Regions:
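Substrate-binding clefts and substrate-entry loops adjacent to catalytic sites
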Residues: 116-129, 164-171, 179-207, 211-222, ...
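LysM (lysin motif) carbohydrate-binding repeats in extracellular/periplasmic proteins that recognize
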Residues: 306-335
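Bacterial N-terminal signal peptides
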Residues: 9-18
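Catalytic and substrate-binding regions of cell-wall glycan-acting enzymes that process beta-1,4-linked
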Residues: 67-120, 145, 169-171, 176-179, ...
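Primarily a LysM-type cell-wall glycan-binding module
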Residues: 288-315
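An acidic, Gly/Ser/Thr/Pro-rich helix-cap/linker signature
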Residues: 20-149
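Short, functionally critical alpha-helical segments immediately adjacent to catalytic or ligand/cofactor-binding
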Residues: 150-167, 227-233, 322-325
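Bacterial N-terminal signal peptides that target proteins for export
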Residues: 1-9
């Protein structure tokens, strides 16, 4: 297919600042740091945010407004198919409820969990912002976790990592909803080049995150709290903490390890969220619902495509298209792939037909 060109919008000009090139020599490392600084500036452009650039650096604050398709462009998905089971079994209509019904990680009576739980319960507006960002992607992520038979609590991990912001960028050079640093992202299949950063691609980063968590869980003999701590602070650091406790004759469970302050709060955040979601009625907490149906579809585009042209074919704005496909840095998809776009479910078939003409 021949590319069609359109005048560059301010958004695409901003995106043009975000390319990262990962090489080993010092010059390229300096260029990477320069590009990442520029990406923080582009982050403010993308979010149309009047706050300081630090809002883009500190993703965990959950204050960044991401442009996602609104209710007019992102339908709630296809109707549930009537099956015999539905007459004898309650249909779960909320994705969060679907996930929480299978929560299994134990939640001890620990002051660190209590502190995090207290904060979340006092800030329901934070969860409202998070769920708004999560809405397009939550069903997909839930499905992928279920396919792998992993703990369903992992559906909450993007809240802890990035407040479900695929554009999030931390001071530690971690990017995307799952917050991968460049090296680990590349290690788990996320391409990073001038055109594209797979750490911000929801499909690539979700698959990479679940691959990494599976690897860590195996490394720590099925101990999910150790695996989660390692996801945050690095596998080597957790291994050293375990060895130090063994030498000192101390318990080696997560709660007794000498880990960085951030990591000591990281696992309790996840468990506090799981406890609130599982027991939201007891806490009188209005956790916003997300309908338990698919609302997006991954569409094969076959080759490089101009994003403005793709948005026109899909009948959506360029900002809405980029909100679903935040991995692309430039005016077009990467010539080297991945050759796919995430689109609203109700627009995918018509887009594919128009693209094929």
């Amino acid at each position: 297919m021949q590319l069609k060109f359109f005048p560059l919008s301010p958004l695409i000009l901003a995106l043009g600042l975000t390319g990262c090139q990962l090489t080993d020599n010092n010059n390229d490392n300096a260029q990477l740091e320069s590009n990442e600084t520029a990406s923080l500036e582009a982050c403010s452009e993308i979010h149309n945010n009047e706050e300081a650039i630090s809002d883009c650096e500190i993703a965990r604050d959950g204050v960044i407004d991401v442009v996602h398709p609104n209710d007019d462009t992102l339908e709630e998905g296809a109707e549930l198919t009537d099956t015999p089971d539905m007459h004898t079994q309650a249909v779960v209509t909320d994705v969060w409820e679907r996930a929480s019904a299978n929560f299994a990680l134990p939640i001890p009576d620990d002051k660190r969990i209590s502190a995090q739980r207290k904060w979340y319960l006092k800030h329901p507006e934070y969860m409202a912002r998070v769920v708004k960002r999560a809405k397009p992607f939550l069903y997909y992520i839930t499905e992928e976790i279920e396919k792998r038979d992993m703990p369903m609590e992992l559906v909450l991990l993007p809240i802890v990592e990035s407040a479900f912001d695929p554009f999030a960028y931390s001071h530690g050079r971690a990017a995307g909803m799952w917050q991968f640093i460049p090296g680990t992202g590349k290690r788990f299949g996320m391409q990073q080049n001038w055109w594209y950063d797979g750490r911000r691609d929801v499909v690539a980063s979700t698959q990479g995150a679940l691959d990494y968590l599976t690897y860590l869980n195996e490394m720590f003999d099925g101990n999910w709290l150790h695996a989660l701590a390692a996801y945050n602070s690095g596998e080597g650091r957790v291994q050293r903490a375990i060895k130090a406790n063994k030498r000192a004759g101390k318990p080696t469970d997560f709660w007794n390890l000498n880990l960085p302050k951030e990591t000591r709060a990281y696992v309790p955040k996840l468990l506090a969220l799981a406890d609130i979601l599982k027991n939201k009625d007891e806490y009188a907490y209005a956790w916003p619902e997300v309908e338990n149906v698919a609302v997006i579809e991954v569409v094969d585009i076959g080759s490089q495509v101009d994003l403005a042209f793709a948005a026109e074919l899909a009948g959506m704005s360029l900002k809405e298209l980029h909100g679903l496909n935040p991995g692309f840095n430039r005016w077009a998809t990467s010539p080297e792939g991945p050759h796919r776009l995430i689109l609203p479910l109700d627009k995918a078939a018509a887009f594919s037909q128009a693209l094929a003409k």
